[in-house]
Amino acid sequence: MHFSKMHGLGNDFVVVDAVTQNVFFPEEVIKKLADRHRGIGFDQLLLVEPPYDPELDFHYRIFNADGSEVAQCGNGARCFARFVTLKGLTNKKDIAVSTAKGRMVLTVKDDGQIRVNMGEPIWEPAKIPFNANKFEKNYILRTDIQTVLCGAVSMGNPHCVIQVEDIKTANVAQLGPLLESHERFPERVNAGFMQVIDRHHIKLRVYERGAGETQACGSGACAAAAVGIMQGLLDSPVQVDLPGGSLIIEWDGEGHPLYMTGDATHIYDGVIKL
């Protein structure tokens, strides 16, 4: 099997062309490939599949290191666009893809940055999914070690975002797993810890479901910016500083799609026997 190793701000991926190759990934195979000592090592495995709809260019699938399939990965989307361009699978600047829960347009800009139309943030609790009677800008979540206020939103995958005073001392290691598996999120959740610097600038750490804390989470950056704007803390555009680098998020409010712009880096190509 031919693959490429890529990263988006340190969030690393193995990307596989399933358009020209016949591949099959049982959960145990994904876990072996994800092992950083005995496999290749990655946060997520990305599959480029033929489109299910003739109006689209590709279908985009994402698997976590634990073998679970998820519907969205923003950093992965940028790497997906870079991959299909580098491999000559398309020569389009605007690439339309489907995911498990919707559609996205990936734009390769002239400066090499990739702008992703992430669609509209979803606030309705049942669609996140999140157990709540109605939408609120802040929800109270009780855990074994701390009660927190959080915003909840879906960017194609579920996110909760809590505001912290200092990102360096945020209790991500302990609170992250408790939020990820909180009973009010039936499909688990990605937990974002956000420090507001000013109305156009935040710092963020994300504990991702199925992956733990990562260097960067694109959909998490989108969720944090959207929650901050919805709560009246931020204005678009928002620079989001993650441990692995920065993203620019643009959102004009309800009824409008959210855009994420950032880099995607090709590291190397390889071949592995499955």
From Swiss-Prot:
Sequence positions that bind substrate: N11, Q44, N64, G74, N75, N157, N190, E208, R209, G218, S219
Alphabetical UniProt keywords: Amino-acid biosynthesis, Cytoplasm, Isomerase, Lysine biosynthesis
Principal localisation: cytoplasm
Subcellular location: Cytoplasm
Entry keyword Cell membrane: no
Reactions mediated catalytically: (2S,6S)-2,6-diaminopimelate = meso-2,6-diaminopimelate
Lineage: superkingdom: Bacteria
Important for dimerization (site feature) positions: Y268
Transmembrane segments: none
GO molecular function, one term: diaminopimelate epimerase activity
InterPro entries for this protein: DAP_epimerase_AS, DAP_epimerase_DapF
Site (Could be important to modulate the pK values of the two catalytic cysteine residues): H159, E208
Entry EC no(s): 5.1.1.7
Gene Ontology terms: cellular component: cytosol
Gene3D superfamilies in alphabetical order: Diaminopimelate Epimerase, Chain A, domain 1
Pfam families the UniProt entry points to: DAP_epimerase
GO biological process: lysine biosynthetic process via diaminopimelate
Active site: C73 (proton donor), C217 (proton acceptor)
Biochemical pathway: Amino-acid biosynthesis; L-lysine biosynthesis via DAP pathway; DL-2,6-diaminopimelate from LL-2,6-diaminopimelate: step 1/1
Protein family (similarity comment): Belongs to the diaminopimelate epimerase family.
Function: Catalyzes the stereoinversion of LL-2,6-diaminopimelate (L,L-DAP) to meso-diaminopimelate (meso-DAP), a precursor of L-lysine and an essential component of the bacterial peptidoglycan.
Subunit structure: Homodimer.
Name recorded for this polypeptide: Diaminopimelate epimerase
